[in-house]
């Protein structure tokens, strides 16, 4: 049988090693790695013995598909026939008289490319799976229930009474006290409660803060009562939160203010802020 040649362009040493490994594993033992096709001994001998064969005849001879049978290998390899495309399907510009051009081959080696793709995918999977990835699991139902419980506790509980003003014991001394007094006069007046010593700030045109201080800290009576239960408070805003959280709707509170409460508030105002006793507004 006349020798047949399969030309595969290799663009790197790594590709050449991969091709050699694949051929060895499949039982092929006769192959050469050449930089110049003219250096092949068989091709050189043919050119010397048959100089009259034209280039067209060689191309016609090589145009038919060829098959290679696997040789005996010590490894268990199934006998198979590999069909390669003919030279006529390859562009003539790929092979020159000086050797093989360093370009990407138009005749691809399928198994090598598939192996490279598989190896890249495996490396990518290993890289992704090797990263520490911690998933935090949230119990949305538990968080929602906890938030609802906190909100209900905040709305239904007794409001925390924070006096409006500052304690007289924290007054600055010296020049700082003078500057603080000037600043206080510019934004409003501070009045010290005679019962608890808390300084309450009130606007120049009103006394609402003083009244709230007296009712919240020094009186028992509360003017607002829930229409659905016995809850009492002195602020409408707190009553609204209570009705929404406990009864599911915004129910206007019932004003239970009577003369006894007004008298209590007036007496407390006289003790807390004597200068406002004549105009407390509770008995008007």
UniProtKB/Swiss-Prot annotation:
One of its GO terms (molecular function) is DNA binding. A zinc finger (C2H2-type) spans 224-247. The keyword DNA-binding applies. The keyword Plastid does not apply. Its main location: nucleus. Expressed in FLP neurons. One of its GO terms (cellular component) is nucleus. It is found in: Nucleus. InterPro entries: Znf_C2H2_type. Residues 50-71 are annotated as: Disordered. Keywords: DNA-binding, Metal-binding, Nucleus, Transcription, Transcription regulation, Zinc, Zinc-finger. Residues 50-60 have a biased composition (Basic and acidic residues). Positively regulates the RNA polymerase III-associated transcription of small non-coding RNAs. In the presence of polyglutamine, mislocalizes to the cytosol and loses its transcriptional regulation activity, but is able to promote protein aggregation. This is Transcription factor lir-3. It comes from Caenorhabditis elegans.
